[in-house]
Curated annotation (Swiss-Prot):
Changing F300E: Decreases interaction with HerA. Does not affect dimerization. Decreases nucleolytic activity. It comes from Saccharolobus solfataricus (strain ATCC 35092 / DSM 1617 / JCM 11322 / P2) (Sulfolobus solfataricus). NCBIfam families: NurA_Sulf. InterPro entries: DSB_repair_nuclease_NurA, NurA_domain. GO terms for molecular function: metal ion binding; nuclease activity. Keywords: DNA damage, DNA repair, DNA-binding, Endonuclease, Exonuclease, Hydrolase, Manganese, Metal-binding, Nuclease. It comes from the Archaea. This is DNA double-strand break repair nuclease NurA. Belongs to the NurA family. Homodimer. Forms a complex with HerA. Mn(2+) binds at D58, D133. Its EC number is 3.1.-.-. Its cofactor is Mn(2+). Involved in DNA double-strand break (DSB) repair. Probably acts with HerA to stimulate resection of the 5' strand and produce the long 3' single-strand that is required for RadA loading. NurA and HerA together stimulate the end-resection of six nucleotides of a linear DNA substrate. Processes linear double-stranded (ds)DNA probes with 3' or 5' single-stranded overhangs or blunt ends. Has endonuclease activity on single-stranded (ss)DNA and nicking activity on dsDNA without HerA as well as 5'- and 3'-exonuclease activity on ssDNA. Binds ssDNA, dsDNA, forked and bubble DNA equally well.
Length: 339
């Protein structure tokens, strides 16, 4: 089968190349003027970055379907860094088994995000800026019907009791509690740190700038090369996604600014969300400061946290084996084929 595909590739090479050229040419004709209008080249002021400290947080997770359920492990780490180096601040993690269910992977992701947000709330005061991986809107998630929860279950949210939440027997209720917890934590982070939190995305599907079939970040990577930043986009949080508890009311009234930036010539474009209305002066200050801790156009503290929390193939296999040996040791009748 694969040989047939290779043969087709050889036969169609020129046709595919022409298709790529035609798409690029079409895009250039359609939006080059907009790119020129919306992209601002900028020369970094390196003096701004000398004393700035960044707290960066990222998380990692994996889940393995097994006959007994979904074995999962999640972790999160906060680091602090400046132009002299990066060191770890805090780590947290959870490991367990969820019963099989359609939303098991979603619960794993929500649990990882809760660990990230908890570390950000705790360690954010140690730096000048907090760097969070991913977009602000994704972290906020979707509205949860709070009528399904008892007062005791809502108390789990206010106490940030993760162990209590993942002990809930009803999987759907557990998922919704995790969603609500993440909204609660985002609101606390915003109340505490406001515009000092930068939500950074390497990948974005946003099309607010150019309105083409291609994400804005792709267009900017295709048609710009120099260090710079895009036109600023002011947005409101979608109130239809905000749950109805008073502790997260701040999210209902909140504006935030989105912009794209390239921190080094020829490197990747990243997306940045920041709470409030900011102007180009603030964007330039952010670029100046981020450039002091960036490698190949990406903030190194965030990259360090990302690399530290990744579960390698070896990590995954080791965890699965440990879970299996633990079951055998503690439950003698447990057959090996169950895991």
């Amino acid at each position: 089968m694969i040989r047939k595909i290779y043969d087709k590739l050889v036969e169609s090479h020129n046709e595919i190349k022409n298709q790529i050229y035609n798409i690029a040419n079409y895009l250039k004709q359609e939006i080059q003027d907009k790119v020129n209008e919306y992209w601002n080249e900028y020369v970094i002021n390196h003096e701004q970055s000398e004393t700035c400290k960044f707290v960066a947080i990222d998380g990692g997770s994996f889940g393995r379907p097994m006959r007994i359920g979904i074995v999962y492990a999640v972790g999160a780490e906060s680091v602090i860094g400046d132009n002299k180096g990066v060191k770890t601040l805090s780590e947290d993690g959870q490991i367990g088994i969820f019963k099989p269910g359609n939303d098991a992977q979603e619960r794993i992701s929500l649990l990882m995000e809760a660990l990230e947000l908890s570390l950000a709330l705790r360690d954010g005061s140690k730096g000048d800026y907090i760097l969070m991986d991913g977009s602000l809107s994704k972290k906020i998630g979707n509205k949860v019907d709070i009528q399904q929860f008892s007062d005791e279950e809502l108390k789990l949210i206010r106490n940030v009791d993760l162990n209590g939440i993942i002990s809930i027997k009803d999987e759907r209720k557990m998922r919704d509690l995790l969603m609500l917890l993440n909204q609660f934590l985002v609101s606390k982070i915003i109340e505490e740190y406001d515009g000092n939190v930068l939500w950074i995305s390497k990948v974005s599907r946003g099309r607010d700038l150019f309105g083409t079939d291609y994400p804005d970040i792709t267009v900017l990577e295709l048609f710009t090369e120099k260090r710079g930043f895009s036109k600023l986009i002011i947005k409101n949080i979608d109130i239809e996604k905000i749950s109805e508890i008073p502790e997260i009311e701040v999210l209902r009234k909140m504006e935030y600014t989105t912009f794209y930036t390239r921190l080094d010539n020829g490197k990747r474009v990243i997306r940045v969300d920041i709470v409030g209305r900011v102007d180009e002066k603030i964007v330039k200050e952010i670029m100046d400061r981020l450039s002091g801790v960036s490698i190949k156009g990406y903030p190194f503290p965030l990259l360090k946290a990302h690399m530290d929390v990744r579960f390698s193939a070896m990590d995954r296999e080791k965890i699965i084996k440990l879970v299996g040996s633990k079951l055998h040791k503690d439950i003698e009748w447990w057959p090996s084929q169950f895991y």
